[in-house]
Amino acid sequence: MGKKKKRDGAAARRQARVVVGGVRTRAAVTARRVVASAEEGCGLVGRGGGGGSGGDDGEGGCYLRLRSRRLPFVAAAVVSSRREEALGDSVAEAASSSSSRAVELLGCSGEEEAMAEKVCTQAGEDHDEESSVGDSGCGRERSATTPSSRRPPGDADSSDAESNQEAKQQMCRRSSTTSAAAFHAGATTRSFRMMAPPAAAAEIEEFLAAAERSEAERFAAKYNFDVVRGVPLDAGGAGRFEWTAVGSG
């Protein structure tokens, strides 16, 4: 009993030293602050896993309270998942842009095939008539595919894509028209070569006779000699030469 009383007395004396006239000492205040901050930190860590008041940063993370600010700690799994989501979005955008590009290219090739079929079906018609019809058709198609000026200002990307597609279609039409003109020119030349009959013998003789006649007249006027019959002309002719008979002996 004596020892217990001594211990109780020592505790009372220590408590009296700590609390003097209702005022706490500096050591007790510091100890209480340390305990309170530790309890508050534990509470924040417990709330971080549940996501109650942590917001977006509470998913797999917690707050570390400092003297001036709080630092959020995010788990590595959350960071990797967010990076994967961003990468997936970028891949999806690239795939959509490539698909739209492929659609534009396919549209241009289909237009070219349609123009080629139209040219093949109209191969027997006149070239001038076909050119006028093609020009009028191109004008109608160009007026139909021209983007409207009343398009809203937020649709600038789609208008640029349509203008690029229209330019590609015009290039395809020009190339197909040029190839069609060359094809028709070659076909016309081949048909003329195949349909032209050979010249008759009478036509050839008539052409050569006219040339021989003009050459005989020129020779007679200069040499006073008839090359057709092989005899000299009269002395009173227009030629400068006179012919005399020479004896054979």
UniProtKB/Swiss-Prot annotation:
Residues 118-180 are annotated as: Disordered. GO terms for cellular component: nucleus. GO terms for biological process: regulation of cell cycle. GO terms for molecular function: cyclin-dependent protein serine/threonine kinase inhibitor activity. It comes from the Eukaryota. Residues 161-180 have a biased composition (Polar residues). InterPro entries: CDI_dom, CDI_dom_sf, KRP. Keywords: Protein kinase inhibitor. Pfam families: CDI (PF02234). The keyword Disulfide bond does not apply. Gene3D superfamilies: p27. The keyword Nucleotide-binding does not apply. Belongs to the CDI family. ICK/KRP subfamily. This is Cyclin-dependent kinase inhibitor 2. The lineage of its organism: Eukaryota, Viridiplantae, Streptophyta, Embryophyta, Tracheophyta.
